[in-house]
């Protein structure tokens, strides 16, 4: 307790007595508690072995499937997602709750970040690739209730997406490293997907998506961070370490995004980048030349 008082987590109004501070009161909120537990148990443990993972990769960007700090810390050859889905679902549930405590993951930001209703002129079909249970897709449909938008949510592990509310999405099992089965959609939407993977893996995902696009009406919408070139925010830099330790991925600057997209498919290019004023999120609008 003395250490925690010194760090202003608790206060000591008199000898032998301790009291809450604004900081300790945050720990009473379940989502904040889950976030702290995730960072201490998942991220810090993984980061403690990241130097070993980098040494094994000879200090080069890891290939898809190369051991990460997470693999070494948890003694598993499964990636983070496979592990929390199959081996430790309680850890996965905690991770999902923790992500709701982080501002960048606020679902309310996404519909305000891009004029999704404008996609109706190109058919109005949004494919949410790697979209989990469809939370984001449903929020978009609820934000534009009379627009005529439709959403297909793809994920490797399909779950029941039913939830209260009028928005209905179609669920489809799909591995985004395989050929994209939905052709010519107005938008292929990727939220927090690419920062989980190294460049070569991301390029493979983009190639499969580009092959399914219609040159005139399709676009790829990437919702991720875009690191500032001068002095990136501290939170963004910490996310960068998180991605490397857990997944072998990374956050990217605009120059790195441009390089990645051009290296994946020559015909793809970024036409616009929209930055959120509410969080670190951004949307990159990618089209075929």
Curated annotation (Swiss-Prot):
Broad class of enzyme this protein falls into: transferase
User: GO molecular function: any one?
Assistant: O-methyltransferase activity
Its Enzyme Commission number? 2.1.1.-
Summarize where S-adenosyl-L-methionine binds, as residue positions: 155
Q: Which GO terms describe its biological process?
A: methylation; secondary metabolite biosynthetic process
Give the positions the UniProt entry annotates as the active site. Answer: 195 (proton acceptor)
Family classification? Belongs to the class I-like SAM-binding methyltransferase superfamily. Cation-independent O-methyltransferase family.
Q: One Pfam family of this protein, by short name?
A: Methyltransf_2
Q: What does this protein do?
A: O-methyltransferase; part of the gene cluster that mediates the biosynthesis of the aspoquinolone mycotoxins. The role of asqN within the aspoquinolone pathway has still to be determined. The first step of the pathway is catalyzed by the nonribosomal peptide synthetase asqK that condenses anthranilic acid and O-methyl-L-tyrosine to produce 4'-methoxycyclopeptin. 4'-methoxycyclopeptin is then converted to 4'-methoxydehydrocyclopeptin by the ketoglutarate-dependent dioxygenase asqJ. AsqJ also converts its first product 4'-methoxydehydrocyclopeptin to 4'-methoxycyclopenin.
Q: What's the name of the protein?
A: O-methyltransferase asqN
What pathway is it annotated to?
Answer: Secondary metabolite biosynthesis; Alkaloid biosynthesis; Mycotoxin biosynthesis
Please tell me the species this chain comes from: Emericella nidulans (strain FGSC A4 / ATCC 38163 / CBS 112.46 / NRRL 194 / M139)
Record keywords: Methyltransferase, S-adenosyl-L-methionine, Transferase
Among PROSITE patterns, the record links this protein to: SAM_OMT_II
